[in-house]
Amino acid sequence: KPYAKLERLMAFSDTGKCLDLTDKVKDGMLCWKAPKGSWRLIAAFCGKTLQKVKRAAPGGEGYVMNHFSARAVKNYLGRFERAFDGKFKDTAGGATAYPHNFFNDSYEVYGADWSEGLFDEFLARRGYKLEEHLPEFLAAGERSDKTRCIISDYRETLGELLQENFTRQWTEWAHRHGAKTRNQAHGSPGNLIDLYATVDIPECEGFGLSDFG
């Protein structure tokens, strides 16, 4: 399977024109005759981080999940359901009671700043197309007010996806099974207060640490 999937291919002219060329890419080849002028092409790909779970508990080894994807989180929680219901070979012999709490030990997924379908989510939530502003979004150096607004909207969208698709779905799932959620939200790409408010027991670690030597 390919390491990354093309999400958008955008062309930007020196006169301010923007074209979406995504549907002109077939089998990895672009079929497009550029109009007169100077054009800059920006391709946006979505791929896997290939990160493994850190300090995994027995049975929890493997790749990290996509916290922004409702489907990925649902699949992850479904594995726990099958385990507690005794539907795995190594758990055959009857169901096991769910614990009183499920604990999320902080957000430690580095470089995970995108998700499949994020362009569509951005449009639905922010009301404009992020792909049409990729030059500003990716610009280095001093940021203009417009660029700051675009980046703020992008971060808000990621935060909403994390809260809705991971934190809220996880908490609602736990409640259906008579359990509560404990969460360390620090490190998450979202509004920490909102994330803490979405769980039953907010926790933190190392907040405001001082070196007492």
What is the role of each PLM region?
Residues Y98, F103-S106, Y154-N191:
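Aromatic-lined carbohydrate-recognition surfaces of secreted/lumenal glycan-active proteins
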Residues K1-S152, E160:
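Mature extracytoplasmic enzyme cores
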